[in-house]
Amino acid sequence: MILLFYTSSFILDCLLGDPYSWPHPIKAIGNLIKWLTIILRKIFHGKSLYFAGGLLFVLTVGMTGAVSWFILFLSAKIAYWLYVAVFVYLGYTTLAMTCLAKEARKIQRTLADGDLAAARVQVGMIVGRDTDKLTAEEISKATIETVAENTADGVIAPLFYLFIGGPVLALMYKAVNTLDSMVGYKNEKYRAIGFVSAKMDDIANFIPARLAWFFLVIASFILRYDGRASWQIGLRDRKNHTSPNCAYPEGAVAGALGITLGGTHEYFGETVVKPTIGSGTKPVSEKEISQTIHLLYMASTIAFIMFASIYLLLF
């Protein structure tokens, strides 16, 4: 029965994505992080912000787990059908496959129309780097990198934790991931208060990132991209990133499409030097964005089937 709930959550994400007007736990988690960060910065200063960052992590993840568990508990007390609906809905909100694909498609269409200024604004909504001076190729690369990375932490990882611990654990993971995306930067403003969140996100994504690489390789073979290069580049360039995890899915995509990703970018006005991922020399355009979206859908579907099969064998 639980497997049916997980399947329903996955299907809902495939069909609906994340409608902007719907209530969403991740929005609430984001608001909680903003509120806690403001309070903790008023209390702690200097090196004590490292301790504050630990508190921020514990409070955010702990409150997310407690509230989501209580909502499920309360709904079960009221009616079983309500419990099922809440369970499925909470699980669905942790998945970002369709939403990610839609945002990438918007950028792809804008680039195809030749509206570079609008494309810069759109890509700025899904990446952390400065986008006001990006070329069309750089926008395409940024979009591809984001889709590749979020195949891991926006789909594979939530599915992984959903199958292990249900919506509560999946939402706790999303809290970790949201913390990293909001405060896990290495600049002066966030280095201290975001240190714990960044490290815990690395730990939480350690297994999912490598699973994402594996699923993307399989997807590459199925879609008749360069599956062998996807495997090889994912392994060869796995350390070519400031994150211990991101290069796995990015390398798989770069190899599959025969392109080069990564390199030096600007974040909050500061230049961050990064090694490249992949060894392809062909220009990157909106065509490769479309191919990356295909990889996202295929790898996500493979992941769900694999996790569901293992769940059936074990339970």
UniProtKB/Swiss-Prot annotation:
The chain crosses the membrane at residues 54-74, 78-98, 152-172, 203-223, 295-315. Keywords: Cell membrane, Cobalamin biosynthesis, Membrane, Transmembrane, Transmembrane helix. The keyword Cell wall biogenesis/degradation does not apply. Its main location: membrane. It is found in: Cell membrane. GO terms for biological process: cobalamin biosynthetic process. Pathway: Cofactor biosynthesis; adenosylcobalamin biosynthesis. It is a multi-pass membrane protein. One of its GO terms (molecular function) is ABC-type vitamin B12 transporter activity. The keyword Membrane applies. Belongs to the CobD/CbiB family. HAMAP family: CobD_CbiB. This is Cobalamin biosynthesis protein CobD. It comes from Listeria monocytogenes serovar 1/2a (strain ATCC BAA-679 / EGD-e). The lineage of its organism: Bacteria, Bacillati, Bacillota, Bacilli, Bacillales.
